């Protein structure tokens, strides 16, 4: 007589497997939707944060209303150096630090920008060769502390100013920082969204700013809370 036990077992196993697959489908769908919602939320937060960051970037030159003990220029463009030396010459600060200067940047090279700069460079300008914004901030701290400065004018490009103020403020919490943003010609000429290169530059700087704020908050070397850039405006 033929046996049917094996066929019955196969049928039960097949039904069990089908039931398990059916039970897993809602779970997979829920996981898929949760992942989608999470990704959309992250994109939304980053987008809103970027728009906030854009609002912190000055689009016009500012007029200083106070002087400071010292001036620090974070290099990256000749206009920053020129503006910083003009501030020094007008008596806005006692001494200038050009931070992150290229090796070729010296009194002779700066004099080519304007011959009148030479006497100021020879008497009242210091240089350091730091390689990034954190290095700028550390060198600025050492320079300011060695001279007993309690207030600084910070000169850098407008899009770099939020990160520069965060880094320097973290290194020098007891020193008053006065931003002097240098607005690039591209930002003056057209809206940031009209130029792909400018948009990428601002987005890159925004992501670096986020990384800086996270690193500062978890910096084991200090428990200092650094205020957002807008607190200095």
Residue ranges and their predicted role:
Residues 53-196:
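A structural signal for short, hydrophobic/glycine-enriched beta-strand patches
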Residues 19-62:
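N-terminal type II signal-anchor transmembrane helix
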Residues 9-10:
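Acidic/polar hotspots within intrinsically disordered regions
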Residues 223-233:
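Hinge/cleft segment of the Venus flytrap/periplasmic-binding protein
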Residues 195-225:
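A transmembrane-helix-recognition feature enriched in membrane-embedded lipid enzymes
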């Amino acid at each position: 007589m033929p046996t049917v036990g094996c066929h019955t077992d196969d049928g039960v196993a097949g039904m069990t497997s089908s039931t398990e697959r059916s039970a897993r489908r809602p779970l997979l769908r829920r996981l898929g939707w949760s992942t989608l919602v999470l990704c959309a939320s992250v994109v939304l937060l980053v987008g809103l944060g970027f728009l906030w960051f854009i609002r912190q970037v000055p689009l016009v030159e500012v007029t200083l209303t106070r002087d400071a003990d010292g001036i620090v220029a974070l290099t990256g463009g000749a206009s920053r150096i020129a503006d910083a030396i003009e501030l020094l010459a007008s008596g806005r600060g006692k001494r200038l630090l050009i931070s992150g200067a290229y090796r070729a940047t010296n009194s002779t090279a700066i004099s080519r920008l304007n011959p009148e700069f030479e006497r100021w460079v020879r008497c009242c300008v210091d240089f350091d060769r730091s390689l990034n914004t954190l290095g700028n901030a550390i060198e600025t701290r050492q320079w300011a502390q060695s001279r007993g400065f309690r207030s600084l004018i910070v000169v850098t490009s407008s899009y770099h100013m939020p990160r520069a103020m965060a880094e320097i403020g973290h290194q020098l919490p007891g020193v008053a920082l006065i931003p002097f943003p240098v607005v690039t010609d591209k930002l003056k000429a057209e809206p940031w969204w009209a130029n792909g290169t400018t948009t990428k530059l601002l987005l890159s700087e925004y992501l670096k700013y986020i990384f800086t704020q996270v690193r500062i908050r978890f910096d084991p070397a200090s428990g200092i809370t650094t205020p957002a850039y807008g607190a200095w405006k």
